[in-house]
């Protein structure tokens, strides 16, 4: 079930504390937004891979591996995964959208799966504007002018950024956990101890020990994140291992570590992205039609909906998805996610 609210139903006046939650990556606090008694989490999907063969396209600095479903002339939807997940988060969403006539594209992010850098000389950079630029390059390579963007975790942040910086390329947006645009300057602000604790892995990755630990224990590390971010999701080992294979990418560790170090100002990006990061540091509004989603059992740090509602200035809805739904919302609640994509497209 989902609780649906229009933008007018959300408060337009909020405190500095709530605003600060929206400005840091994935927010600062885990908010309890459930409106009913928790229900049992949905069982994990079968481990059978229904995606079919991967396609590849050279896009910008990458050889992007992606899945495509649906009619070639259908309206385009691009689904963006997060960390430490992969394209199988959308295994049920993609065919459902394809059945409705959409051309669905699900790319592996740089550093995941079969996506590869075209040159060994390219910096293994994972700053937010670089990931967003990858989406634009992917669209350009496939001659796609506009698309509906939908994502969670890193994918939601990337979709937010593309929508803010290139709104002419985005028909509509679906973002789990809302407005996730941030800056290195905003990340300098210390958080309450309980909030800092939720970001333990970010600080772990800031150390040489953390990088070595992730390199040595990629799958075990990812499983721990899955369990804490979705505490009521009963995924099985086969489901997890299918996605965990994407973390065997040779650039996975350096990409993940760079992403989190960059957020804290501990790693540099590329100067060519400086103009984009400067725009993002002003926390631009998003004017494209948008639906934001939240699971009622999201164990990852995330901002309350009231903290970011004002950032969406176009047609907007917020939906709380109940039933013990955690951070990997498209895989845990595929019907709700699919419906949000269709509805956002028609806002």
Model-derived segments and their meaning:
Residues 1-14:
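N-terminal secretory signal peptides that target proteins for export/translocation
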Residues 325-333:
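Catalytic histidine-centered segment of alpha/beta-hydrolase-like enzymes
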Residues 82, 153, 331-332:
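Conserved acidic functional residues
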Residues 18-32:
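Bacterial N-terminal signal peptides
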Residues 37-51, 61-64, 69, 76, ...:
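Flexible "cap/lid" subdomain of the alpha/beta-hydrolase fold that forms the substrate-access gate
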Residues 55-59:
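Short acidic-hydrophobic surface loop/beta-edge motif
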Residues 132, 257, 334-338, 342:
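Short, amphipathic alpha-helical "lid/cap" segments that border enzyme active or binding sites
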Residues 68-117, 308:
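Conserved HGGG/HGGXW glycine-rich cap/lid loop of the alpha/beta-hydrolase fold
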């Amino acid at each position: 079930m989902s609780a649906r609210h229009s933008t007018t139903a959300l408060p337009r006046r909020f405190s500095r504390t709530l605003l600060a939650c929206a400005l840091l990556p994935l927010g600062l606090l885990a908010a309890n937004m459930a409106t009913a008694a928790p229900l049992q989490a949905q069982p994990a999907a079968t481990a059978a891979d229904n995606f079919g063969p991967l396609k590849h396209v050279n896009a910008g600095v990458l050889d992007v591996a992606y899945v495509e479903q649906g009619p070639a002339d259908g309206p385009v939807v691009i689904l963006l995964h997060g960390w430490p997940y992969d394209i199988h988060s959308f295994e049920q969403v993609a065919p459902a959208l394809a059945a409705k006539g959409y051309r669905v594209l699900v790319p592996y992010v740089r550093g995941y799966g079969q996506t590869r850098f075209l040159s060994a000389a390219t910096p293994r950079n994972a700053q937010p504007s670089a990931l967003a630029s990858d989406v634009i390059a992917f669209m350009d390579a496939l001659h796609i002018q506009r698309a509906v963007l939908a994502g969670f975790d890193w994918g939601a942040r990337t979709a937010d950024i593309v929508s803010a910086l290139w709104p002419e390329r985005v028909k509509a947006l679906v973002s789990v956990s809302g407005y996730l645009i941030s800056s290195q300057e905003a990340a300098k602000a210390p958080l309450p101890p309980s909030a800092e604790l939720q970001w333990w892995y970010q600080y772990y990755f800031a150390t040489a020990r953390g990088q070595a630990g992730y390199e040595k224990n990629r799958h075990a590390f990812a499983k721990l994140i899955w369990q804490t971010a979705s505490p009521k999701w009963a995924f099985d080992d086969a489901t997890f291992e299918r996605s965990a294979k994407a973390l065997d990418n040779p650039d996975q560790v350096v990409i993940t570590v760079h992403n989190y170090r960059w957020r804290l100002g501990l790693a540099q990006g590329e100067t060519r992205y400086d103009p984009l990061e400067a725009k993002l540091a002003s926390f631009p509004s998003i004017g494209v039609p948008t639906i934001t989603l939240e699971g009622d059992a999201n164990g990852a740090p995330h901002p309350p909906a009231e903290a970011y509602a004002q950032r969406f200035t176009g047609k907007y809805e917020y939906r709380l998805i109940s039933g013990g739904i955690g951070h990997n919302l498209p895989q845990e609640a595929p019907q709700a996610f699919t419906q949000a994509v269709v509805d956002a497209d028609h806002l």
